[in-house]
Amino acid sequence: MDDLMARIRASSTMPGFMPPVTIEGVEYVDGALGDTGGIPIDGAQLDGYDRFFVVCTRPRDYIKNEVKRPQTLRRLCRHRPAVAEAIIARPARYNATREMLRDLESDGKAYVFYPRVMPVTNKERNVTKLRQAYALGMAQANAELPQWRVFLGV
């Protein structure tokens, strides 16, 4: 169980805000720094899947902006240059993955859930606000459930 908790913590460790998590001698940070910018569709594709149900936490028209001061970031992360470069590359990777999702959606190969309203950020800790955001998401999910069933064939 401790190993599972460490892996969960590592999956949400935001560089610059939290120290990396070490598992079996290897440091880990948030998976959003990977090849798809935080939308883990690549693993499913490598496993041979060709239809996807994706839940996004940003609205449909969201575009992630480039890092404003990459040189400053490189200095701050000088002991972890790969992390700095991944943070700098993340917006382009994320936006490319979102574009790929739009293409998959147009081809009928993806159902992408986009929130109509997202009243909290990923740094929110106020439990009341988090519960309100959860309730909004559940209401939207319940309204879209018939469409989900059609896409999933259930």
Question: Model-derived features: where do they sit?
Answer:
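Patatin-like phospholipase
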Residues: 1-154
